[in-house]
């Protein structure tokens, strides 16, 4: 008894040693484990085996079909990490699997390799995995022949360079058996796993009338094309596709490799590997291959017919895909059982031809045509229409400025500069139209030129026009300053010249052109877009251009701030200008981060166009809308002087003569000056006259000097001194002299400062009005 006890203990000890052997699984996949197809199921079996056997280590490698070099690295890495059960799941890597299996044949490393037959010379640690895919494709072809409404079915296969054509022939024979007059469409995609090509190939078959499509791909791309076209799909990847697509999949075959993994992992753990083993499975074994439930869209009578065919296929003597006499055209001999010789059948590279009833159309190798992807029509048409409307508005505004150039609100804002500003707006809108079109070598340069020049004209003229107002009103000593339009044009041209110079550098050094880029902007590898590109020197010049426009914006902001104190409405455009500049700056703070962050080309173009149109249109409405509104509501006011703000008016009312005015014929500063220069005045010789007003206050002298286009000078001196002679307004008008507003008698010294302020306001009002139109300069040194 003791001897038996010792023997039992020893056996238990060795049993524990055997069970404690490690099993590290490595799975090499041809595609993605997320394809919901063959690769997914191979990896799912690894996960389930790891969980069931409580393994400490397992690993997988994906997308190895793309590069044999990467596949070889995966083999080496798996061996380096100590994997001792390596699964090679694809026919593509059979050669590499057998190579490394031969190199490690003397080690405790075991292999499961998918293939058709055992290697020669044979390797004891290799299990050959295969399943009867021919009967499955035959069954799905039979189902398709029963379900088709058009009488046309299709098949997508890797092709003769990758796989046997017997899968294609099996599907065709199944469909022909169900419907003898079937039309069969066949196409090759040169890969087990290329979703883009497979999807496009299936779409091509659908366009040619196929309403059911079989495949020998590792993913559901073909069936997705079917369902996207409103047709019913069939599951040919081994995944229970009804879990994902529901009733849109008519029927699927299911493969479950967990039993395979667990079986051979236990052999590794128990150290009892079955040498020279093979794992061939089919419907009859019911261990790894099953048929899924039918969709509710499949009629019951068709379900019954398919079930009957399944039962016949489970009889191993029923092999219609190898025994049909129609197969004789392949040139493969039949064996004694009336079947095509298996090895030659599996290696067949020839597609069956049609007969007098059925028809076979071979599309051969399929390649996706390279497709040009343009901007969406919504962007192209939307930007073009909106920009066109904005250009029309600009032209209308330009017409109004020209027609009503002598109106008070237009004349005070310098019509010439207003026209240049509107011209800049038109150019900006034209640039937006070019931005919305597909780039070409010409438009890549033209749109940048137009956009830059447009903003330079727009902001540059605003800057210069308001710089003059700042210089004239920022004049505490009331010195004589003559700044006509012709003195400002060189500044505008200087700003424009700087812009043109930078653009010329960008154009000359940047090598600006349009490139066709495949796979750009989240496109597939079979789609391309035209993209504007430049060299590094061009990028530097473009950044310099952005800095230049940024400086123009800053200067415009500064000048707008400086003229905000001007209390004469017609001259003080600081509010609309500042608002316009702020809007542009705000958009830049939005545009720049969006442009730097990853964005599609369409999104970038949309952002640029929308911001350019919105900022320019709002700025234009702010600058011109108020002017035209005043013209419409208050009249053209061509013969009226300039209205001041509330603050200015209140000062004028305090300093003017009221009920206590001893001289009813005196003219008051602060009141509207209704006079205007006429063409007759411009041709009269200058004269100087003294006009005496009786006033008890101290004497004052104001001298107005007119700078006409003829460069002649006329002076009007008004000498306020003690005199009993009064001159009325009518007498002044008869002499065709501009009426001069005075503050009359000052009742006390406390009002002197207010009088001087109003004198200055009126003098400056008249001066800026005339000088902006190149007509008059005012010398007020003696006020």
Curated annotation (Swiss-Prot):
Polar residues bias spans: 763-783
Protein known as: Metabotropic glutamate receptor-like protein J
Membrane-spanning intervals of the chain: 384-404, 416-436, 444-464, 490-510, 539-559, 576-596, 605-625
Underlying gene: grlJ
Gene source species: Dictyostelium discoideum
Description of the deletion phenotype: Cells show precocious development. Alterations are also noted at the slug stage and in spore formation. Slugs are longer and break apart several times on their way to culmination forming smaller but proportionate fruiting bodies. Spores from fruiting bodies are malformed and less viable, although the spore differentiation factors are synthesized and sensed normally. Mutant completes development 6 hours earlier.
Biased composition (Acidic residues): 670-679
Any GO BP: sporulation resulting in formation of a cellular spore
Residues in the signal sequence: 1-20
């Amino acid at each position: 008894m003791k001897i038996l006890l010792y023997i039992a203990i020893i056996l238990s000890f060795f049993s524990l040693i055997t069970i404690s052997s490690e099993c590290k699984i490595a799975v090499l996949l041809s595609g993605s484990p997320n394809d919901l197809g063959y690769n997914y199921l191979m990896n799912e079996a690894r996960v389930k085996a790891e969980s069931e056997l409580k393994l400490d280590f397992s690993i997988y490698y994906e997308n190895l079909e793309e590069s044999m070099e990467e596949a070889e690295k995966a083999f080496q890495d798996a061996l380096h990490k100590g994997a001792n059960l390596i699964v090679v799941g694809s026919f593509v890597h059979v050669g590499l699997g057998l190579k490394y299996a031969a190199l490690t044949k003397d080690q405790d490393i075991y292999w499961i390799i998918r293939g058709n037959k055992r290697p020669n010379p044979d390797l004891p640690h290799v299990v050959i995995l295969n399943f009867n895919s021919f009967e499955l494709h035959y069954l799905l072809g039979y189902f398709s022949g029963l379900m088709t409404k058009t009488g046309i079915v299709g098949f997508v296969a890797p092709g003769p360079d990758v796989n046997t054509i017997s899968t294609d022939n099996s599907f065709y024979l199944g469909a022909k058996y169900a419907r003898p007059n079937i039309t069969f469409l066949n196409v090759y995609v040169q890969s087990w796993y290329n979703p883009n090509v497979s999807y496009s190939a299936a779409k091509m078959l659908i366009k040619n009338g196929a309403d059911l499509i079989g495949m020998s791909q590792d993913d559901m791309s073909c069936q997705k094309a079917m369902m996207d076209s409103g047709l019913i799909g069939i599951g040919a990847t081994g995944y229970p596709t009804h879990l994902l697509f529901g009733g849109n999949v008519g029927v699927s075959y299911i493969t479950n490799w967990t039993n395979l993994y667990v079986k051979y992992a236990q052999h590794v753990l128990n150290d009892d590997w079955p040498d020279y083993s093979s794992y061939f499975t089919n419907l009859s074994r019911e261990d790894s291959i099953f048929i899924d439930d039918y969709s509710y869209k499949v009629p019951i009578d068709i379900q019954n017919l398919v079930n009957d065919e399944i039962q016949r296929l489970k009889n191993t003597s029923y092999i219609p895909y190898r025994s049909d006499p129609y197969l004789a055209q392949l040139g493969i001999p039949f064996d004694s059982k009336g079947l095509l010789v298996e090895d030659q059948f599996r290696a067949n590279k020839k597609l069956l031809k049609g007969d007098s009833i059925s028809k076979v159309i071979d599309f051969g190798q399929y390649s996706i045509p390279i497709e040009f992807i343009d901007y969406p029509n919504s962007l192209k048409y939307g930007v073009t229409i909106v920009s066109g409307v904005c250009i029309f508005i600009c032209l209308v505004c330009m017409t109004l400025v020209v027609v009503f150039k002598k109106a008070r609100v237009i004349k005070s804002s310098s019509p010439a500069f207003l026209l240049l500003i509107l011209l800049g707006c038109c150019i900006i809108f034209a640039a937006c139209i070019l931005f919305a079109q597909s780039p070409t070598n010409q438009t890549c340069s033209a749109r940048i030129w137009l956009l830059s020049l447009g903003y330079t004209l727009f902001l540059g003229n605003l800057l210069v026009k308001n710089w003059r107002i700042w210089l004239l009103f920022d004049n505490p000593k009331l010195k004589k300053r003559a700044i006509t339009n012709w003195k400002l044009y060189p500044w505008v041209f200087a700003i424009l010249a700087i812009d043109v110079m930078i653009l010329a550098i960008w154009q000359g050094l940047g090598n600006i052109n349009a490139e066709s880029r495949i796979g750009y902007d989240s496109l597939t590898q079979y789609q391309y877009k035209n993209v504007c590109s430049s060299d590094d020197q061009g990028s530097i010049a473009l950044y310099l251009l952005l800095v230049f426009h940024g400086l123009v914006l800053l200067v415009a902001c500064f000048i707008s701030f400086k003229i905000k104190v001007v209390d004469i409405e017609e001259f003080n455009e600081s509010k609309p200008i500042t608002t316009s500049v702020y809007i542009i700056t705000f958009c830049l703070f939005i545009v720049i981060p969006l442009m730097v962050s990853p964005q599609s080309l369409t999104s970038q173009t949309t952002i640029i166009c929308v911001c350019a149109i919105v900022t320019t249109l709002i700025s234009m409405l702010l600058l011109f809308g108020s002017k035209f509104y005043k013209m419409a509501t208050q009249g053209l006011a061509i013969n009226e002087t300039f209205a001041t703000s509330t603050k200015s008016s209140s000062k004028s009312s305090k300093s003017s003569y009221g009920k206590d005015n001893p001289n009813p014929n005196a003219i008051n500063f602060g009141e509207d000056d209704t006079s205007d220069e006429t063409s007759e005045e411009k041709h009269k010789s200058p004269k100087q006259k003294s006009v005496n007003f009786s006033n008890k206050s101290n004497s004052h002298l104001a001298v107005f000097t007119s700078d006409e286009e003829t460069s002649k000078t006329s002076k009007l001196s008004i000498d306020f001194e003690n005199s009993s002679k009064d001159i009325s307004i009518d007498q002044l008008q008869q002499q065709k002299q501009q009426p001069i507003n005075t503050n009359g008698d000052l009742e006390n010294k406390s009002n002197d400062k207010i009088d001087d302020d109003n004198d200055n306001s009126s003098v400056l009002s008249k001066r800026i009005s005339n000088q902006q139109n190149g007509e008059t300069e005012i010398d007020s040194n003696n006020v």
